[in-house]
C-alpha cells in the first residue's frame, strides 16, 4: 500500500454532496492541501471524453468516488433505467480512468442496498449475492455491486489498490430536508420542527421555514394561515399531532456523515487490498461495511427527535402505510478490526443536525 503525502493530489468526486463535502472537510482538517473537486457544471461524470480529459489534465494520485445518481423510493421505482445507467456510467468513467492513469489509491462509496432483501441480520459482507435484492432499488443496487466488483477485479488483475465501502443510512450537515423526497431522519426532523411552530401558533416561524425551503414551490408570504395549514397537513403536520407513515416498528441504523467521512479517509490511508482479500483462491467480498452496529425503532427515533425539537403534540402512526424492510443492521466487525469506530452517537447527532438546520442559511434541497 503506497502512502500519500500532505501535498498529494486527491480528487473527491461528489465533493458538494452530503458525504463528499464531509470528506473534503476531513481531508483539510488532516492537513491535505492539494484537493480537487468539480461541480456537475464543470465536469459531467457521464461524459467519458470529459472525464478522460480531466484525468489527463489533473493526474490525481488518489480518488474518492462519492458521486452517484441517488433518490428516494418512488424515484428508484419509476426511473429504473436512470439509476442503473447513470451509476454504471459514472463508475465506468471514473474508476476506469483512475486505472488508466495509474491512480495509486481509490475508495468507492456504495450502499448497503447491495445486500439481499432477506439477508441474515446483522448483515455481513459475505451476504452479498446470496439471494434476491429488494425489487424497488434493484437497478441502483446492481450498479453499486458492479462498482465494487470492478474495484475488486482491477485489484486482482492489475494490482491496483481500490477499496469499496458500504455505508449505512447517513445523516448530517447539508442533508436533504425536502418534504417531498427527503430520507427518514431529516424529513422527520423538519416535520417535527414545523409541527412545533404550528403548536405554538408561530406562523412567522412557519413562513420563515417555508421561505428557506419551499414545499411544492409555495410562496408562503402570499398564503393565508389556513392555506399553509392545509398544505402541511398533506404531509401529516398539524398543531396537535405529527402523523407518520407505518407502524414505527422497523429497526434502523444511522451514521453521522462526518463519521462516514472519517471512515472513508481512514480506509484510504490505512487499509490495503492485501489486508482484505484473504488466502482463498476465490477472492470476493472485499468491500467494507461502515456503520455503528447499533439500531433503534423508527418510533424510538421519532421520540428522540420530538424531545430534541421540543414538540409538545402527539405522534400518531398510520399503520396502513408501508413499513419497508423491518430490520437493516450492518455487521461492522471488519471496519472495527481495521482500526476505525464511530464517535457520534445518534442522540448527539440529532441535536447537532437540528442545530445545523436552525442556523443554516438555506438547508440543502438537492
Q: Residue locations for each model-derived region?
A:
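Active-site Tyr-X1-5-Lys
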Residues: 135-168, 184-200
Amino acid at each position: 500500500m503506497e502512502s500519500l503525502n500532505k501535498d498529494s493530489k486527491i480528487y473527491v468526486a461528489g465533493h458538494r454532496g452530503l458525504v463528499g463535502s464531509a470528506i473534503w472537510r476531513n481531508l483539510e482538517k488532516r492537513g491535505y492541501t492539494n484537493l480537487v473537486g468539480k461541480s456537475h457544471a464543470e465536469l459531467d461524470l457521464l461524459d467519458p471524453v470529459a472525464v478522460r480529459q480531466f484525468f489527463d489534465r489533473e493526474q490525481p494520485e488518489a480518488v474518492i468516488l462519492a458521486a452517484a445518481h441517488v433518490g428516494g423510493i418512488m424515484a428508484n421505482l419509476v426511473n429504473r433505467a436512470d439509476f442503473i445507467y447513470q451509476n454504471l456510467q459514472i463508475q465506468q468513467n471514473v474508476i476506469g480512468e483512475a486505472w488508466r492513469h495509474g491512480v495509486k489509491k481509490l475508495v468507492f462509496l456504495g450502499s448497503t442496498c447491495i445486500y439481499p432483501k432477506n439477508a441474515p441480520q446483522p448483515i455481513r459482507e459475505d451476504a452479498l449475492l446470496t439471494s434476491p435484492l429488494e425489487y424497488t432499488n434493484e437497478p441502483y443496487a446492481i450498479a453499486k455491486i458492479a462498482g465494487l466488483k470492478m474495484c475488486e477485479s482491477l485489484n486482482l488483475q492489475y494490482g491496483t489498490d481500490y477499496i469499496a465501502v458500504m455505508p449505512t443510512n447517513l445523516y448530517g450537515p447539508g442533508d436533504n430536508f425536502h418534504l417531498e423526497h427527503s430520507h427518514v431522519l431529516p424529513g422527520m426532523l423538519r416535520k417535527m420542527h414545523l409541527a412545533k411552530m404550528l403548536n405554538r401558533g408561530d406562523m412567522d416561524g412557519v413562513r420563515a421555514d417555508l421561505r428557506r425551503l419551499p414545499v411544492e414551490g409555495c410562496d408562503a408570504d402570499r398564503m393565508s394561515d389556513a392555506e399553509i395549514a392545509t398544505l402541511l397537513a398533506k404531509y401529516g403536520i398539524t398543531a396537535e399531532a405529527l402523523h407518520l407513515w407505518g407502524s414505527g416498528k422497523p429497526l434502523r441504523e444511522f451514521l453521522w456523515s462526518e463519521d462516514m467521512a472519517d471512515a472513508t479517509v481512514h480506509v484510504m490511508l490505512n487499509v490495503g487490498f492485501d489486508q482484505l482479500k484473504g488466502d482463498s483462491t476465490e477472492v470476493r467480498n472485499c468491500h467494507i461495511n461502515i456503520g455503528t452496529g447499533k439500531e433503534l425503532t423508527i418510533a424510538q427515533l421519532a421520540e428522540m427527535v420530538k424531545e430534541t425539537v421540543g414538540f409538545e403534540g402527539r405522534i400518531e402512526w398510520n399503520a396502513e402505510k408501508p413499513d419497508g424492510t423491518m430490520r437493516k443492521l450492518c455487521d461492522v466487525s471488519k471496519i472495527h478490526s481495521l482500526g476505525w469506530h464511530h464517535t457520534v452517537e445518534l442522540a448527539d447527532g440529532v441535536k447537532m443536525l437540528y442545530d445545523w438546520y436552525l442556523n443554516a442559511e438555506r438547508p440543502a434541497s438537492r
